């Protein structure tokens, strides 16, 4: 099993897509774990208000599903992912510098974040399946299960790293869970942990996907090559060297 994992990680396509996943999920873990602190201490929201904003966040995420799906009909998954993440990254950095001072601001931030968040959960699993076919073409092995399990391991690792980083940030900022009011430094860092810090990890995810070589055209070529191989014709792998 570990030998197969090692062989998979030698492939550029696998490294790029796993890197994109790991970086996004670290930022996602920080964003999700920080929300309650930010809403409670920075925004002084009541339990009812927090419930409403969480419901709005969920509604926005669901609303983006058909939009992301529609975008992939016009441009490929890779380009849609990059564009969505850039929108979220830029928007969250702007909010990080301007600050969030109202309930409406939280709603707008949620809208901006959900662009990239929805793109990740909708597109990256499909992109991972594209990697499975690239692996089959280049290595003559059907290892979809191994690729998916590797992704599951990376998700668990990313969540752990994100939560550890969140804990370190709060500790260094002087955050105290027992205090009714936090220091200015602690609230400054809970603000950054909801905006700029997740945006940094989104940007790293974008860089990985920019490097990721499977475009819509390349994927079509991979499927054609696999079809020729199954028909008994050995395809020329030279055009696919960048997948390796």
Feature map (PLM): residue ranges:
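Membrane-embedded alpha-helical bundles of multi-pass transporters/translocases
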Residues: 1-244
């Amino acid at each position: 099993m570990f030998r197969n994992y090692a062989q998979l990680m030698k492939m550029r396509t696998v490294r790029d897509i796993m890197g994109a996943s790991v970086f996004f999920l670290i930022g996602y873990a920080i964003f999700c774990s920080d929300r309650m602190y930010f809403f409670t201490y920075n925004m002084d929201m009541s339990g009812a208000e927090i419930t409403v904003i969480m419901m709005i966040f969920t509604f926005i995420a669901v609303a983006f599903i058909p939009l992301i799906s529609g975008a992939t009909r016009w441009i490929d998954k890779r380009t849609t992912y990059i564009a969505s993440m850039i929108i979220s990254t830029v928007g969250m950095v702007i909010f990080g510098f301007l600050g969030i001072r109202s309930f409406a601001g939280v709603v707008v931030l949620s809208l901006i974040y959900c662009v990239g968040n929805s793109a990740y959960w909708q597109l990256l699993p499909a992109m991972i399946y594209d990697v499975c076919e690239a692996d089959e073409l280049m290595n003559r092995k059907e290892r979809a299960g191994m690729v998916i399990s590797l992704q599951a391991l990376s998700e668990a690792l990313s969540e752990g790293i994100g939560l550890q980083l969140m804990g370190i940030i709060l500790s260094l900022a002087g955050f105290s869970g027992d205090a009714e009011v936090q220091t200015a430094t602690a609230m400054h860092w809970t603000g950054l942990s909801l905006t700029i810090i997740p945006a940094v990890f989104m940007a790293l995810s974008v860089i990985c996907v920019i490097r990721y070589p499977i475009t819509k055209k390349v994927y079509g070529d991979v499927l054609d090559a696999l079809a020729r191989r199954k028909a008994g014709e050995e395809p020329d792998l030279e055009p696919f060297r960048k997948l390796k």
